Amino acid sequence: MQIHQSAEDYLETILMLSQRMGKVRSIDVVNELGFTKASVSIAMKKLRENGYIAVDGEGNLTLLAPGREIAERIYSRHRLLTHFFMQLGVDEKTAAEDACKAEHILSEQTLE
């Protein structure tokens, strides 16, 4: 199934926040990404409907197996590319921003 870059970004953000904070709610995603509550709410609904996340009665977000697989793949790419760009002399902030853009478009072969 083809998944959009924005969905990959949401899944990656949920993964990173869960590693940092334990429990993750939509408001945490709003604060991390700087998007509106409405746009995050719509995205979370789509991710839930497509079987990528679950939302419990308290609003906590959990990555389901398909969502976790995508999030871990994207996050791994992000870390690899950030490190690579920093090795080229790019500052950490710029390296992370550029990695976020590149992580979605490079092939598996390129990243091996």
Task: List PLM regions with ranges.
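N-terminal helix-turn-helix DNA-binding core of bacterial DNA-binding proteins
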Residues: 2-35
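Basic amphipathic alpha-helical segments that dock to polyanions
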Residues: 10, 29, 40-50
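Residues within the alpha-helical elements of helix-turn-helix
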Residues: 32, 70, 87
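The short coil/loop that forms the "turn" connecting the two helices of the helix-turn-helix
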Residues: 34-35, 58, 90
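Amphipathic alpha-helical dimerization/coiled-coil segments
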Residues: 79-112
